[in-house]
Regions:
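Bacterial Sec-dependent signal peptides at the C-terminal "C-region" and cleavage site
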Residues: 20-33
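Aromatic- and acidic-residue-enriched segments that line the glycan-binding/catalytic groove
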Residues: 83-95, 129-165, 204-236
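Aromatic- and glycine-enriched glycan-recognition loops and surfaces
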Residues: 48-66, 93-116, 181, 185
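Bacterial N-terminal signal peptides
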Residues: 12-21
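Catalytic domains of carbohydrate-active enzymes, especially glycoside hydrolases
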Residues: 55-81, 195
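Aromatic-lined substrate-binding rim segments of carbohydrate-active enzymes
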Residues: 78-126, 237
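Active-site-adjacent "subsite" loops/lids of carbohydrate-active enzymes
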Residues: 32-50, 123, 128-194
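Hydrophobic faces of well-ordered beta-strands that scaffold small-molecule active sites
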Residues: 37-41, 71-73, 121-123, 200-202
């Protein structure tokens, strides 16, 4: 047993050890606070406003003042047109009467001014989007109509997505190897052009929804993958 005369000394020693342990825990290295607030700059809604470097600086400062630490800049629209001088994709050089020259480097200004203010700047790309059905504009209307999704309608019909004017998204068929190769080349080009961007965000990296794609190509791919011949297409899907 413990001698009763030694108990106060033991209790004091244990209490001292407890205090030291607590202090060690409290003195863990401080971590830099991470700002998870993102401001998204849509390329169509802000086309006119962001066509001037001083406007970009102005709204970046307002963004920072509001407590945001990150900005996302749309650089490839749902039409498949890009907002930088690409050697692959068509350039979005105008929108609703406002024009831009190909040498206008919008994201370059965002990166320069944003980094000066301590903001992180990300570029956003709409990957499998290729047309704006409300404006009949985009690569599915011009360069590559054969790449658009085929939609299975409630009435049983199969319709190109460009003909569905209640849906503004003119989506491509992600299962088409030509589409995937084309998009991959754009992503590589973009990453190499903007190495100082803090990251790339992929938007619409998907099918339009469960009603697409029902093209002959997708049917062939499904049957090859599953080993099943679909006798009643698309009813049995």
């Amino acid at each position: 047993g413990i001698n009763i005369m030694k108990k106060p000394a033991i209790i004091t020693a244990l209490f001292a050890i407890l205090i030291i342990c607590c202090q060690c825990t409290m003195k863990s290295p401080e971590k830099e606070a991470v700002n998870h607030n993102y401001m998204w700059f849509d390329c169509e809604a802000n086309y006119a406003t962001l066509s001037h470097p001083d406007s970009i600086r102005f709204y970046l400062q307002k963004t920072k003042d509001l407590g945001f630490g990150n900005v996302v800049v749309d650089m490839k629209s749902i039409m498949g047109e890009v907002l930088y001088d690409s050697q692959i994709a068509p350039y979005m050089g105008d929108w609703e009467g406002v024009e831009r020259s190909r040498d206008y480097d919008m994201l370059g200004y965002f990166i320069e001014y944003g980094h000066e203010m301590g903001l992180k700047v990300f570029g956003s790309l709409n990957v499998f989007a290729g047309g704006h059905n409300f404006f009949n504009r985009g690569i599915i209307y011009n360069e590559h109509p054969e790449w658009q999704s085929i939609v299975y309608r409630p009435d049983g019909s199969l319709v190109p997505i460009s003909e569905i004017k209640t849906n503004y998204n003119g989506m491509l068929n992600p299962s088409n190897p030509e589409v995937r190769e084309y998009q991959k080349n754009i992503l590589v080009e973009f990453a190499e052009r903007y190495p100082d961007a803090d990251g790339i965000i992929f938007d619409r990296l998907r099918y339009d929804n469960i009603t697409s794609d029902f093209s002959p190509l997708s049917r062939e791919q499904f049957e090859a993958w599953s080993g099943i011949t679909v006798e009643n297409y698309p009813e049995d899907i």
